[in-house]
Structure formats: structure tokens, C-alpha cells
Amino acid sequence: MSILVLWLAFFLQTEPLSAVRQSPAAVASQASPDAVDWNTARELAPGIRLHQDALTAPRPIRRCVARIDLEQPGLRLTTTPRLDAWQNNSKETRRQTARNFLRSERERLRPVMLAFNADAFSPWPVPFDQETETNLLGFAVSDGQLVSTGSGTPSFIRLKSGAARMQVTDAAMTADDIEVAVSGFAFCLLDGVVQPSGDDLHPRTALGLSADGRWLLVLIVDGRRHSSAGATTAELGQWLLELGADDGINMDGGGSSTLCWWNPQLPGDDKSELLNRPVGNGLKLLTPVADQRGVSERANGNNVGVYFQSP
């Protein structure tokens, strides 16, 4: 029995011998996609368009990119609210999968159309889809309320005025005049310059912002699959640059990377639909058979929702 278990583990998780690692610079240059024609991209809602593609070089890579017009009348952002019994830097939010977050916001009569994961968080005990209390790692604001203090990492911030920016935030940062804020690990793109990185490949979530602050780009890269091996953070920066961003942040990734929306065309009451193929259970599905195992969703410490409110 032990031999069978070991063989199955090898079959499901071993990377093919043909996979070759290259330098981050070489990978970024080879993986550059053609420019996206956003005028013909799929419109999910007014001001929200979706582009999906599958690259074959330098490795199989499947990407989802949502472009959000922050100047679209009535467009609002929200995030996971802080706990009623909130304790700063200890117990700040309750984990939810991105789809459960979308569902719960709609139950609150807030018609979220698009949702995605954001901040890193700890702890995240197994099973990874359980809704437990957790602490966010970085500055976070939800509907004007401070959720987590800054820790010297870059943040995406949208003010109550509608203006947006990306900046490094520390413990002195307050929630004054801020609608929402989420934080990531590091800049992958800064002032139009792609930031260097290692060559580790993972599922990724990245946020990009155009120089004028109008366009928010949400880039999700699937990984740990035979059909999509993941990306480096330098690749994220290169792609965001080509997609029109001036700054970009590498957010929480791995099994947390999720993009979903409310598809009004689906039958039944639950119209939440995944747009990527997350690996929330932490498994590596690196053979064709394993890749057919489907998807698993992780409960994240912070999710972002896009909805519309009458101006």
C-alpha cells in the first residue's frame, strides 16, 4: 500500500523532465503577448472588460486579465470587512473564498459583479477552504474603515473621491479619505520599469494601475498545472506594462489566486462563476491526468469586489 501511495504522489505532483527553467529576463522577453484590443474584449459589465489567453512559450501559461474603468459612473470597490470583534494585527477578518465573498455581498444587497483575492494573510490552517479568523499582512481599508495597519509593503488605494494610486504604506498610514486599500508583497512594475525577480514559478495575482489612475488591471495567472505552469514576478511586471499599467503590485498568489464574476446568463440562483482555475488545496497537478482533477478554492483573508451604485 505504501508503494502505491508514493507512486500516486509522484504521478500527481512531479514536474515533467522537459520543463526547463530560464533566467527571469529571458522568460519575460519570450512571454511578451500581443497587445490586447480592449474594444473587442468581452464586456462583463459597464467599464469592466475581460481578456483571457493561453501562451505556449516559454512554457504553458494561462492568463485572465480584467480591466476596470475607475472613472465609470457609479463603479465602486469594496473588500472583506473587518471582524466585529476586531483585534489589530491579530484577528482582523474572516476568510472566505472569492466566490463566497461575492455571494455574501450580494446577499447584503450589494450587487458585486467581479471579485478577486488580494492581501496575504496568516494563519491559514487546513483544510484551506474553511472560514477562519485571520490577520492580514499589510495595509487594508474596507469601506473607509481601517482593517490592517501598514507594514512597509506597496498598496493599491482608492480614495473616496474616486482617485486611485499605488504607494508603499507603513504603520503611520491612516484610513482618512480612503474608500478601499489592499496590499501585496512588492512592486513588480514601478514608474514604468519592470522590477527584477527570481525564477520561481507560481500561480499569481497582480494589480496594475495606469499612469493617469483611470485603469485598474487585475491579472491572474494559473499555475501548478500541466496546462499552466505559473509565472515569475518579472513576467507579471512585463505583462502589466504591455497592458497599459505604469505601476504594478505582486499580490498574494499561489492557491489564493482567484478571479470570479456574477454571470447573469447562468441558470439557477447561484450565478457565481470562476474565470480561472485555482489550486486552493495546494496540490500540484503537473500531469495531463492530474490536471483534469478540476479546481479547488481557498478561503482568502481579503477579497476585492466591484459593484455599481447609482451616482
Region locations from a protein language model:
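Conserved, well-ordered active-site substructure
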Residues: 125-150, 193-211, 215-246, 256-311
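Conserved beta-alpha junction segments in alpha/beta enzyme cores
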Residues: 49-67, 179, 183-213
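Active-site-adjacent helix-turn-beta-strand microarchitecture at beta-sheet edges
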Residues: 116-200
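Sec-dependent signal peptide recognition
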Residues: 1-6
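Short acidic-glycine loop/turn motifs at beta-strand connectors
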Residues: 69-71, 157-163, 169-171, 209-214, ...
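Short, solvent-exposed aromatic-acidic interface loops
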Residues: 80-88, 171-174, 220-225
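Zymogen propeptides
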Residues: 7-149
